[in-house]
Amino acid sequence: MYVDSHAHLEGKRYDSDRAEVLARAKQNGIEAYLAIGNGDGPDTADCGIRMAEKYDGKPEYPRIWASVGIHPHEASLANEAADSQMLQWARHPRVIAWGEIGLDYFYDHSPRETQKAVFLKQMELARTAKLPIIIHCRPSDNSENAWDDCLAMIVEHWSAGHGSSSGLGGILHCFTGSVEHARRALDLGFMISFAGNITFPKAQSIRDAAQMVPLDRMLIETDSPYLAPIPHRGKRNEPAFVKEVARQIGELRNLPAEEIGSRTTQNFYNFFGLALETAKPEARA
């Protein structure tokens, strides 16, 4: 049993075979996936909700949960009307997280100061909605300062004063940092999610982190359609391939892939306060 804790299946790359992709996931033991609600910007941040409304609850597909939020790429598009709309979407019964949000200094599609301001606002909205946050953090090639900035903002505006005391917490998705970054995130109460890039030859720092992170603080994901793992690298990614992430982590820790899948599945349901047997959310305080 596996859960893909982060995927984007709403895009055009799946228009011709989306149902088949979901069916393949279920056939490969994927119990559920989290449909990330970023879309092409604030106006389409309900894309995960629309996926859940169309496909969730059908026995041939995985269960589908959703998030809402503004990706740092689209930070320049944020406005008060969008914030209000996302708070409305956050009330949907399938929405369990706010994200992905954070900082991206690699592409810099939005100015960095704008990214920081919107990241702060998104954390405020997540607190209002009482939802955990899903963090996107990508540094530039020649600097790790995105990690320092991102973790500092989490300390100041989320975990220290709000997240740890309220129990909201968060997930560092598609982790690409160092062992030290992972330790700092764990100290802040975050889960660490590993994606297909853990299988890439040059990703030793990610593999080192995966050996250090306690199994009960770990999630796995595909980040589909991106970062297809070896042996599928270069292809369009899909949730069925999350088993390759589990296999790689299992090899690092001398455990069967199935155990990594089972443990991270339980972690997903525990973190979000969901009942595994019924896949219905428990009441939030």
Task: Go through each PLM region and give its residues.
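Mid-domain alpha/beta scaffold segments of enzyme catalytic cores
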Residues: 1-285
